[in-house]
């Protein structure tokens, strides 16, 4: 499987909220971090922490979709420009209530080793 196939498999599972399939794309010691507006909003270390976060996150959205707009690959790393759209299933704050739409554009930096994602950093 190519690195881009791995990325697309992860995104397909993410969009389907299939956490078990998502996790097959990651190595055991993986690191995930989300950076929004220059601030870290989430970080996990290891597959167990990632699974817990992924399961909580999947329940928060009625629907969610990442679309890959462009991909650059080199040195065991992929940089993907992502268009993100989601509809909340739960209230997150007074401004972000169930039914609210989220539309973001961001970049995902994915490091791959041994055919698995070992680090995923999402920037928006």
Q: What are these model-predicted stretches?
A:
Residues 4, 21, 27-75:
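A solvent-exposed, acidic/Ser-Thr-rich amphipathic alpha-helical stretch
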Residues 10, 22-23, 30, 46, ...:
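Hydrophobic pocket/interface hotspot
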Residues 2-18, 25:
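Short, aromatic-enriched amphipathic alpha-helices that serve as compact interaction elements
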Residues 51, 55-124:
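A beta-strand edge to alpha-helix "cap/lid" segment located at domain peripheries
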Residues 11, 37-38, 76, 124:
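Proteins with a high burden of low-complexity, intrinsically disordered sequence enriched in S/T/G/P/A and R
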